Amino acid sequence: MGDILNTDQRNAANGFFDFLFSSEKELIISGPGGVGKTFLMSYLIDRIIPEYENACALLGKPSVYTTVTMTATTNKAAEVLSVATNRPTQTIHSYLGLVVYDDYSTGKSILKKTNDWRVHQNEIIFIDEASMINSELFKLIHEGTKNCKIVYVGDHCQLAPVLEPLSPVYKKNFPFYELLEPMRNNGQPALQAICNQLRETVETGIFKPITPVKGVIDYLSDQEMENEIKKHFLNPDNNCRIIAYTNKRVIDYNDYIRELRQYKNPYEVGENLVNNTSFSTMIGRKSVTISAEDRVKLLDISKEIQQEIDPENNVFLDVVEAKIQTYNRQLRVLLPTNKIHYKKLINYYKNQKDWVKYFSLKNNYLDLRPEDASTIHKAQGSTFDTVFIDLSDLSSCRQPDMVARLLYVAFTRARNRIVLYGNLKEKYGGIG
């Protein structure tokens, strides 16, 4: 396959070639970030699929597969993959013709087939960030494909879908190729070593101490942490991120950083924020969706107004109308000015099983959060030059297998430097 590939990539490429001639429908390519999974996908499309077609011609048989499609489980992953490969990429949901549907009888959001749903045949389908495929989506992938070859690309050591211990992709005995030779972080051996150690912990369940390395894996005191936050976050810097386990701790960090910047209002013109949950609105007759984790810039904010939520019980919500920009789109949305009140209302109507008001609150108001700190779950799929990790908050998780994955995902978000703060419980390895 040529010297352009390392040994792991070459094994996967050879396996993919054999896979195209086999009766197997699905294949897995797994590995941590920075090992060349995206490069390998391009190589398989540009080199191996043409080799397969040439082999079919030599054998005097037609090529079975007529189309190659690149997809990902999230909009963010699809965008990253499209930019990295210079190929059209869409979400697997869009490809299959699925939308999230609010079930007013149960209060749950489920996947529903649209008029665009059809059964795809004779295609080679790549699905990136496959660790996020839950049982519901996995079933629909099988329903929506016939005589296709599906390549799941991801990292089986990352965090699993919500309420599932592991993606069903990794519970099956599909052909499995693992890439472990790093291409990212290859200038930081200490980062490579700790990421390998934490990956091993996910696989074995054995926690080992985390050893600081000055300038690469720094362990800070309270005062040092405060100084570093001021240094990196006084002015907005999208190359740094603070990550923690709980939403409460994330909110504390973001509130502190907004105070450092002397922000006085719930929202400031020019502020960069991220969308917390998927949101759809209409522009004319066209539906526009802002996906979870999409970056949003506030362009203009109007005066505060009150919205009726439950007038019979004198329940109102204070909001502002804001002009925002996300990607190349500009649109006007309503933003709750008191996020705590907004969240309490959602939880109240959820507990009351009043699904009409519950979904009305979730669907009519954009839930924007500061981008400087996020949960580890939200950070999965992103990389930053410097990552700050709150170890005390992470230690509050009581599930060792979850902690192993949280540590692994947290550390593998960094390109150059990790900053540690707080205490990691001894049962989770501690600090060496």
Spans of features found by a protein language model:
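C-terminal accessory regions
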Residues: 309-432
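ASCE P-loop NTPase helicase motor core
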Residues: 14, 18, 25-213
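Conserved helicase motor core of P-loop NTPases
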Residues: 10, 14-20, 24-25, 37, ...
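Dynamic helix-loop-helix/coil hinge segments at AAA+ ATPase domain boundaries and subdomain interfaces
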Residues: 1-10
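Structural motif
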Residues: 124, 241, 385-388
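Short beta-alpha junctions and helix-cap segments that line functional grooves
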Residues: 137-138, 285, 402-407
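Conserved SAM-binding loop
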Residues: 5, 70, 242
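Short, conserved phosphate/pyrophosphate- and ester-handling motifs at nucleotide-, phospho-/glycolipid
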Residues: 9, 74, 246, 381
